Design a protein with these regions (language model features):
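Primary recognition of N-terminal secretory signal peptides and signal-anchoring hydrophobic helices
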Residues: 1-55
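Short, acidic, Ser/Thr-enriched surface-loop or helix-capping motifs
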Residues: 94, 100-101, 123, 128, ...
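Short, flexible surface segments
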Residues: 70, 96, 102, 115, ...
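Conserved active-site neighborhood of the chymotrypsin/trypsin-like protease fold
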Residues: 56, 81, 101-179, 199-201, ...
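N-terminal activation segment of mature serine protease catalytic domains
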Residues: 53-86, 96, 118, 142, ...
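Active-site loop architecture of trypsin-fold serine endopeptidases
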Residues: 82-86, 90-92, 116-119, 152-154, ...
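PDZ/PDZ-like groove recognition
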Residues: 80-83, 89-92, 208, 255-324, ...
Length: 358
């Protein structure tokens, strides 16, 4: 008797079934590989591994992801002071936000809501709710507003290590006008760890982002939040988002302390001109405006000295320093390396907390 043929999705495959004791057996490798899965064998563990990738085409997957995530993205509108050529005046401001808690907490950009006197959140279904500002941190450009509504659909967060240049992403937000609420644009991750005049690193994307998209969601093809869309260069495909690792850091600080407890060294730092242009530099950070009671001054360092390392991690830009400081709290002790009079000296200092005015 000839071996039975095997079909996967209506197509015959090269693997034949085997009949033993009137029972039909089909080799899994051939079936799974024909279905687009990766099959591997671990000799040491004597186990088979099957990695099933998403079999949907882009034309099917993208609408599915948008449909899943869109209810978690909201529009934000409010009245407040706006600055223009003609001075300060009352106006209407708008942006986007992402639901992060079923009990009504919504994440957005700080610059979207910081000047709003009244805040209205408009859901995907068009329903509006008054909101209150709960947390804000302008250094990371993140804020949380809260509405009196429960049972909301929340966005899932991606893992930072899964954010890779070239991967496809979708931006969902409310560009330009509320008649375009929850618009979606598709693009790719263009770059990571971008420093573009902001205190912290950003994710770069070629996804179209415009006025009103700020505070919206940048998501991957698994429907997970990659970042909060924040800024871009007008008329280009060069746009940016606050990455999910910074989002997680800030939300954790909000939960623990009601604010982000930023670190202060009690001094201003000047980058090398190459670092200011985004060119790799090993010049360190020149100390300026050193306060007499600052941790660095207490360690006998002075203006004009150069900070080169913190806990043996080389520091060559302000963004690098700020990113490293996300691992510390005020009151922690760190070892700094400072070039003074042509010689690198090391000292343990206790970190201060940054004041609001710094």
């Amino acid at each position: 008797m000839a071996a039975p043929n095997v079909e996967v999705n209506g197509t015959q495959i090269d693997t034949d079934a085997v009949i033993i004791d009137d029972k039909t057996y089909v080799p899994l490798r051939g079936v799974f590989e024909a279905a687009g899965a990766e099959v591997s064998w671990n000799e040491e563990k004597q186990t088979a591994g099957i990695n099933i990738s998403n079999s949907l085409s882009d034309d099917e997957l993208i609408p599915s992801v948008i449909e899943t995530v869109s209810p978690s993205v909201v529009g934000i509108i409010g009245r407040g002071k706006t600055e223009s050529y003609y001075g300060s005046q009352e106006g209407i401001m708008s942006g986007s936000g992402v639901i992060i808690k079923t009990g009504g907490e919504i994440l957005t950009n700080a610059h979207v809501v910081k000047n709003m006197n009244t805040i209205l959140v408009v859901m995907n279904d068009g329903k509006g709710y008054e909101a209150q500002l709960k947390y804000i941190d302008e250094d990371t450009d993140l804020a949380v507003v809260k509405i009196k509504k429960i049972g909301l659909p929340v966005v899932k967060f991606a893992n930072n290590e899964d954010i890779v240049v070239g991967k496809q992403v979708i931006a969902i937000g409310t560009p330009i006008t509320f008649s375009l609420r929850n618009s979606a644009t598709v693009g790719h991750i263009s770059g990571l760890n971008r420093s573009v005049g902001e205190p912290y690193r950003l994710v770069q994307t070629d996804t179209a982002i415009t006025h009103g998209n700020s505070g919206g969601a940048l998501i991957n093809m698994n429907g997970e939040l990659v970042g909060i869309t924040s800024s871009g260069y007008s008329g280009t495909n060069t746009n940016f988002a606050v990455p999910v690792d910074t989002v997680k850091y800030v939300l954790n600080q909000f939960e623990l302390y009601g604010k982000v407890r930023h670190i202060s060294f009690g001094a201003e730092f000047q980058e090398d001109w190459l670092a200011e242009l985004g060119v790799p530099s090993e010049a360190g950070l020149t100390i300026k405006g050193l306060e007499k009671s600052s941790p660095l001054a207490k360690a006998s360092f002075k203006n004009g000295d150069v900070l080169v390392s913190v806990d043996d991690v080389a520091i060559n830009s302000i963004v690098e320093l700020n990113e490293l400081m996300k691992n510390y709290l005020p009151g922690d002790t760190v070892k700094v390396g400072v070039k003074t009079n042509g010689e690198i000296k090391y000292a343990d200092i206790v970190l201060d907390e940054k004041a609001k005015t710094e």
